[in-house]
Amino acid sequence: MLLKHALAEYLLEIEIRKYTPKTIRSYRNNLNLFVRYLTEEAEIDEVEELTLAAVRRFSLYMVERGKKGTYINGLLKTAKSFIQYCYEEGYGGFNTKKNFRWCKEEKPVITAFQTVHVRLMLASCNGYGFLPIRDKAILSVLFETGIRCW
């Protein structure tokens, strides 16, 4: 079966499963990129020709284009779902529940407050009324536990 026909059926399937419109749009965009890579770069037109090596080459292709690990893993998650659907429907592909590798994601670095800034924030809660004491208590909890409010 042609990849574009399998893709159309898969998109119909996720609409039937009542995925949100935003999710469907995201899957459509991600899978169009994946299928375009397969047909133009890897010269794979049939689902039967799809292999794990082709998916890994797609991952490398995205890394070489400077994409971040989080973005690549989002694409791979969508591609994995599509390939598993094709496999279960008997169109071809492979079982993605084995040997599917993810891209390494960068861990975010959270910068800590400097002591001067902490003192200034606590000093801004001056007074003995309800609000200054409450604000100082909230800041103390946030600083002591490392909780981040975004």
What are these regions (language model features)?
Residues 1-150:
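Conserved catalytic core of the tyrosine transesterase superfamily
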